[in-house]
Structure formats: C-alpha cells, structure tokens
C-alpha cells in the first residue's frame, strides 16, 4: 500500500477527494482505476478511453524529449517505436473491427499494453524494438531505390490501368459510331 500511496501523492485531485469524502488516496485511486477498467470492458467507451490514455501519457513524454537539446538515443527510439505500434493498433481498430470483435477483452488488453509501452520508465518501446523490430530483415523494408522506387512502381501500375480503361472506352465509343 505504501507504493500505491506514493503514486496517489502524484495526483492532485486525490487530495481533494481525500479531504472532502474522507477516503484515503490509495483507496480512491484503486476505486477510480477499477471503475475505469469496468467502463473499458463493459461499455462502448472502451475504445475512446483506450485511445485517449494511449495518446496523453506518451505525448507528454514525447514533448519533453523533443524539447531536449540532445535527447538520448534510447529515449528517441522508444518514442518512435511506441508511436509506430500505436499507429498499427489504431489502424487495426479502424479497419479490422470485425476481426477485433472476436478477440475477448481487446480494449482492456490494448489499454494495459499502451500503459506499459508508452511511459519511458517501463522501456516498452526498447523491448519491442530489441526483441521484434531489430530482427526484421532489412530487405523486407529496404528495396533498391527505397520509397521512391515503390512509389514509381505504384504510379506505373495506376497509369497502366488508367490507359487500359481509356482504351476500352475508346473501343466502345468507336463501335457505337460504326453501328
């Protein structure tokens, strides 16, 4: 309980709750945490709360790192990895709703994962990088010419399809004229 009391000391609103309601800070913190967990698990507010916490906690640390004259390499790496993972999870939410609906407690798991991965003190971003991302072969994401080459390939493909469609349209129009 001493550890919980120390954490509760960092949250000013818990002082007001303790004075007005005569509830100890650590119990108020536990109650609020439990209430938030129930809301995440049992209501449609789960995605909103999860995304909000997933943004606010690391955003503050990201701003601190960005304002440093010489940020530590590990700090910058941690935040880059976190925002990349956050983007992937948010994309999963947005585009794979049908799949995610079959994963029990998805937003609860995402909530705790983001609380672990976001703050620098847990080093979640570094752990993810060292154990997963650093092991991805470079050839998977570096190609001759890099991004420029991939964009050129995509542009050429779109151009080919567009030309093909225009040619079909011309053939149809010319066949109508001959009829």
From Swiss-Prot:
GO terms for cellular component: membrane. The keyword Membrane applies. Keywords: Membrane, Transmembrane, Transmembrane helix. The chain crosses the membrane at residues 29-49, 76-96, 97-117. It is found in: Membrane. It holds the Pfam family TB2_DP1_HVA22. InterPro entries: TB2_DP1_HVA22 (IPR004345). It is a multi-pass membrane protein. Belongs to the DP1 family. This is Uncharacterized membrane protein ECU09_1950. It comes from Encephalitozoon cuniculi (strain GB-M1) (Microsporidian parasite).
């Amino acid at each position: 309980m001493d550890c919980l009391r120390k954490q509760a000391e960092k949250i000013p609103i818990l002082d007001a709750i303790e004075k007005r309601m005569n509830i100890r800070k650590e119990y108020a913190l536990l109650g609020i945490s439990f209430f938030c967990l129930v809301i995440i698990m049992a209501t449609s507010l789960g995605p909103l709360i999860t995304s909000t916490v997933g943004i606010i906690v690391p955003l503050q640390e990201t701003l601190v790192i960005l304002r440093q004259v010489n940020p530590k390499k590990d700090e910058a790496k941690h935040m880059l990895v976190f925002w990349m993972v956050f983007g992937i999870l948010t994309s999963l939410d947005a585009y794979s709703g049908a799949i995610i609906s079959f994963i029990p407690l998805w937003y609860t798991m995402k909530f705790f994962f983001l609380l672990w991965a976001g703050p620098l003190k847990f080093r979640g971003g570094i752990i993810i990088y060292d154990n997963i991302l650093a092991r991805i072969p470079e050839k998977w994401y570096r190609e001759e010419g890099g991004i420029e080459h991939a964009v050129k390939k995509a542009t050429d493909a779109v151009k080919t399809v567009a030309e093909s469609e225009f040619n079909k349209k011309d053939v149809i129009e010319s066949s109508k004229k001959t009829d």
